[in-house]
């Protein structure tokens, strides 16, 4: 059992925030191209091409998760695994695993460690306010290899629904970390195990943990 897990998204909100200290005090699960900048133990890449880049880039100590659909193509890499099965069954389109994205699967991977709490960091959901087209895409890797096909902000309704399902089917606390003025979906606010925190609050928590370990 792991006490704390941090699931790192790639929303613009985390730009400038140092996530490195989290590695010593949490089990870190990263999404997609985060491996270009950080050496993590666990990376989730549901996109086939992103998974290929990950296996070409990451060392053997990084476990890479991808969709069951692509898994057989990476059978020669011992550090590639299938994402876990969903903890529930539903009849809607957004309940089908193929319509789940990397962020939600990264959170599901985090749940496998049975932690006391999971930090959801930089899952920004919404497009950048006042910006249109690719400028409105809320992702620090936008425009780079593997992201050029994203021409406009993605409708976050599936993401909101799917994360909400994970909150519902888990025993742990979820701490959603974002900017002070970020709007958390109402459906998430209704969950008793979901809490909102700022980056400043997370930084204070990190310092407290690091002080404890000295």
What are these regions (language model features)?
Residues 1-214:
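Metal-ion/cofactor- or nucleotide/acyl-coenzyme-handling active-site neighborhoods
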